[in-house]
């Protein structure tokens, strides 16, 4: 308390002296402070995570929102020499071409030739066979901050399955466009389902990375 009071007193004295030297008119900086408001997503921080993927056989959980400056994450990682073995597809599919609630089938990506493993059909949690041969799994999907969006449920099951298989999961975080807003009741776990797995409000205010740290 004494230190705070002393600091406040010194600031007041300094302001008084400055004002007196300028005929009672305080002097303020002529240029306003510039604040950098650009947002850098986790996927863009390749300098930090590419070393973690070097020489590793990787599985990618992604969809059409997994972009780096307009280029898909999978295309970017392949260009960087990452050994992607397979892609796990959430609701709406890897390329975002399926409707809401439409089951996704296993297949092959037409552009890259990579195997596509559905996580929105008969299997919502990766099996041990699906994870076999992988050294790491990368999750990168844009979320909107609503509890009923199934991407966070997919992330939950991916983390759970990888923990059981002792495979690390890398979450590439993205901003929550509704991160400033929290609303709605907390889920009663008696009604837990794939469209509501966690005891959080309907509009929860968290990023996928923040939720991953709490799961």
State what each model feature region is.
Residues 1-32:
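Bacterial Sec-dependent N-terminal signal peptides
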Residues 85-93, 172:
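Short internal beta-strands
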Residues 38-83:
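N-terminal phosphate-binding or glycine-rich loops at protein starts, especially the Walker A/P-loop
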Residues 104-134, 146:
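Glycine-rich oxoanion-binding loops at beta->alpha junctions
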Residues 192-215:
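Conserved anion/nucleotide-ligand pocket segment
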Residues 143-155:
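Glycine/threonine-rich flexible loop motifs
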Residues 82, 164-168:
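A short helix->loop->beta-strand "cap" motif at the edges of active sites that frequently abuts
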Residues 96-101, 170-192:
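Glycine-rich, charge-decorated loop segments at or immediately adjacent to ligand/cofactor-binding or catalytic sites
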């Amino acid at each position: 308390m004494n230190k705070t009071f002393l600091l406040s007193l010194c600031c007041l004295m300094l302001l008084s002296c400055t004002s007196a030297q300028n005929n009672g008119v305080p002097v303020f900086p002529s240029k306003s402070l510039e604040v950098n408001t650009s947002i850098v997503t986790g996927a863009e921080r390749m300098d930090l995570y590419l070393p973690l993927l070097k020489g590793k056989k990787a599985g990618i959980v992604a969809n059409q929102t997994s972009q780096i400056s307009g280029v898909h994450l999978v295309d970017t990682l392949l260009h960087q020499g990452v050994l992607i073995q397979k892609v796990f597809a959430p609701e709406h599919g890897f390329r975002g071409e399926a409707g809401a609630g439409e089951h996704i089938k296993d297949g092959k990506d037409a552009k890259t030739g990579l195997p596509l493993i559905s996580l929105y059909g008969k299997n919502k949690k990766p099996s041990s066979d699906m994870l076999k041969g992988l050294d790491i799994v990368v999750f990168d999907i844009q979320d909107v901050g609503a509890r009923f969006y199934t991407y966070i449920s997919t992330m939950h099951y991916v983390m759970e399955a990888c923990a059981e298989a002792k495979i690390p999961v890398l979450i590439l975080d993205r901003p929550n466009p509704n991160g400033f807003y929290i609303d709605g009741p907390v889920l009663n776990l008696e009604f837990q389902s794939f469209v509501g797995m966690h005891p959080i409000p309907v509009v929860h205010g968290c990023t996928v990375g923040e939720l991953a740290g709490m799961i």
